[in-house]
């Protein structure tokens, strides 16, 4: 019998979350972002769950080729573009859209001898200072793209630094929108600015295309809860109690004796650890659910196990069902307790964890 640790992926939840993202930007087309193996949910599952998307966006060129093998016939956007001159022929071969964000990519495209035209997305550095041409160099880059015979359509993109934080005073969304509008003024072509946080909190910035990512998987990029937006958890991580200990005040639990009981307690051992993708730095108090009762993790996270407080659970036993995150325990709540983000927990799900599809 396999270890009782199972991640369930709800395909219907993926569909529902995409529908919600599109409903919030009814006049925009949608790139569904499936980078990092669809945020840990599986590329092929993401493709099926987001069948209603107008295109898929990702980072990895080999994953883009895999999508074509799997039968995806709509557009695919490489969000970081390509990394080597030899990649340019694959853009044409697999009919890929590509971001162009730097001089080196522009030069490689100018020197490429492509027989098939491709669509490119010129990225503006509107203040995040990660990828993209500065406003001062943006129009010159556009003119160079226009002169390349292999370039069919040019679209315009940027990325927000603080869309999940409407009160950020350093670089508010409105300032990045202003810079983008100024840089693209009078330039013909489609525009894309909105990530998940923008779609949820700044719908007026939707433009021609939205690029939802984390919201498609049932989590949010900011302090707001997924539930308040009607998002559904697509990934749930479940396990079981595999050991029970009864301790008294003064007894310690786990490596480093990091947790010391102040009263009699029942401790449960859960088959899940950091080698499965559970955050090693999660502190005592991180929420878990056992047999439908919300309780807490205690002690340090081990490679293969965590320990939890079973004292509030009426009849704990070996085999008691444990939810580590999912529909009844939002992944963002667990991530917040662990000092991280839901993205990391999703993407960090280990290959040894059994995955089961539902719906």
Curated annotation (Swiss-Prot):
InterPro entries: Ala_racemase, Ala_racemase/Decarboxylase_C, Ala_racemase_C, Ala_racemase_N, Ala_racemase_pyridoxalP-BS, PLP-binding_barrel. The keyword Nuclease does not apply. SMART domains: Ala_racemase_C. Gene3D superfamilies: Alanine racemase, Lyase, Ornithine Decarboxylase, Chain A, domain 1. GO terms for cellular component: cytosol. This is Alanine racemase. It comes from Janthinobacterium sp. (strain Marseille) (Minibacterium massiliensis). Its cofactor is pyridoxal 5'-phosphate.
């Amino acid at each position: 019998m396999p270890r009782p640790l199972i991640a369930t992926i709800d395909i219907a939840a993926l569909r529902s979350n995409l529908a919600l993202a599109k409903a919030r930007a009814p006049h925009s087309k949608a790139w569904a972002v499936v980078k990092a193996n669809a945020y840990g949910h599986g590329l092929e599952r993401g493709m099926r769950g987001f069948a209603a998307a107008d295109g898929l966006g990702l980072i990895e060129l080999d994953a883009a080729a895999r999508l074509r093998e799997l039968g995806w016939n709509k557009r695919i956007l490489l969000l970081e573009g390509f990394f080597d001159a030899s990649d340019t022929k694959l853009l044409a071969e697999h009919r890929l859209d590509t971001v162009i964000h730097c001089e080196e990519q522009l030069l490689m495209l100018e020197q490429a001898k492509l027989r098939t035209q491709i669509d490119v997305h010129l990225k503006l550095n509107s203040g995040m200072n990660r990828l993209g041409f500065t406003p001062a160099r943006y129009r010159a880059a556009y003119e160079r793209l226009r002169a390349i015979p292999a370039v069919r359509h040019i679209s315009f993109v940027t990325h927000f630094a603080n869309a999940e934080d409407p009160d950020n005073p350093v670089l508010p969304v409105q300032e990045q929108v202003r810079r983008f509008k100024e840089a693209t003024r009078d330039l013909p072509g489609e525009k894309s600015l909105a990530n998940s946080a923008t779609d949820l909190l700044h719908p007026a910035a939707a433009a021609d295309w939205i690029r939802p990512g984390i919201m498609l998987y049932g989590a949010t990029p900011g302090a707001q809860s997924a539930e308040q937006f009607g998002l559904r958890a697509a990934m749930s991580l479940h396990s079981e109690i595999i050991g029970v200990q009864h301790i008294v005040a003064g007894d310690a639990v786990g490596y480093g004796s990091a947790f010391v009981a102040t009263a009699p307690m029942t401790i449960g051992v859960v088959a899940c650890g950091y080698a499965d993708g559970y955050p090693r730095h999660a502190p005592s108090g991180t929420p878990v659910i056992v047999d439908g009762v919300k309780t807490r993790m205690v002690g340090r996270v081990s490679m293969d196990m965590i320990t939890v407080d079973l004292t509030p659970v009426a009849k704990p036993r070996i085999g008691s069902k444990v939810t580590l995150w999912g529909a009844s325990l939002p992944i963002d709540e667990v991530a917040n307790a662990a000092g991280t983000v839901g993205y990391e927990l999703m993407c960090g799900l280990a290959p040894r964890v059994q995955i089961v599809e539902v719906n």
